[in-house]
C-alpha cells in the first residue's frame, strides 16, 4: 500500500519513540515486577523443582554438593552411595585418611583435591559443630571447600532457608535479562 507523507512520518516517529523506550532504563519497580513474573512462571512450569543430588541428611547433601563442582549430579550420585555406606557421618569421614577416600570418588574430576576437602570439612564439622552441619550461611562458608553456592544449596534443600544459588549459568542469565551487571554472585 502507498503511504502518504504524513503517515510515513508518523510511522517513523513511532519507531523512534519505541527505540527510545527500549533504550530507556527500566525503573526498579518495573524490574521487580518482571522478576516476580518470571519467578511465577517458572514456579508454575516447574512446581517440583528439587536438587538432583541424592541425600538422606544435611551431611550427605553437603558432601555431595562439594563433590559436584565441575561435574554432573548424575556422576556424583554414582559414587555417593558407596562413599556414605563406608563413611556415614562426619566423624567417620573425619577419621579417614585422604588416600582411603580417593578410590570412592576417583571417577570424579579433581578427586584428590575433593577427597582432601571433604576429609578436612568433616574434621571441621566434628571440631567446631559437634559433627553437625551448621544452618547459617556464615558458618557454612567457613568450612573447607564451601562457598556461597554450596552453602545456599545446603540451606535451601536441607534447612528450607530461602536463598539464591548462583552458578555460572544462572549468573549469565541474570545479566542477559538485565537483573545485574555484576560478574561475581556476591
List PLM regions with ranges:
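Catalytic cores of DNA base-excision repair glycosylases
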Residues: 23-186
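Polybasic, lysine-enriched low-complexity intrinsically disordered terminal tails
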Residues: 1-27
Amino acid at each position: 500500500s502507498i503511504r502518504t507523507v504524513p503517515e510515513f512520518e508518523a510511522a517513523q516517529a513511532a519507531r523512534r519513540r519505541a527505540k527510545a523506550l527500549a533504550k530507556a532504563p527500566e525503573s526498579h519497580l518495573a524490574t521487580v515486577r518482571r522478576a516476580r513474573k518470571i519467578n511465577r512462571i517458572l514456579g508454575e512450569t516447574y512446581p517440583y523443582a528439587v536438587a538432583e543430588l541424592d541425600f538422606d541428611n544435611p551431611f550427605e547433601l553437603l558432601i555431595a554438593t562439594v563433590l559436584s563442582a565441575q561435574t554432573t549430579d548424575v556422576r556424583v550420585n554414582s559414587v555417593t552411595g558407596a562413599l556414605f555406606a563406608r563413611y556415614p557421618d562426619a566423624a567417620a569421614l573425619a577419621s579417614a585418611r585422604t588416600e582411603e577416600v580417593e578410590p570412592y570418588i576417583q571417577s570424579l574430576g579433581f578427586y584428590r583435591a575433593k577427597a582432601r576437602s571433604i576429609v578436612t570439612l568433616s574434621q571441621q564439622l566434628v571440631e567446631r559443630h559437634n559433627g553437625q552441619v551448621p544452618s547459617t550461611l556464615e558458618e557454612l562458608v567457613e568450612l573447607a571447600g564451601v562457598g556461597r553456592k554450596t552453602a545456599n544449596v545446603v540451606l535451601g534443600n536441607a534447612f528450607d532457608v530461602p536463598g539464591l544459588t548462583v552458578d555460572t549459568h544462572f549468573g549469565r542469565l541474570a545479566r542477559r535479562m538485565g537483573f545485574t551487571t555484576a560478574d561475581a554472585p556476591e
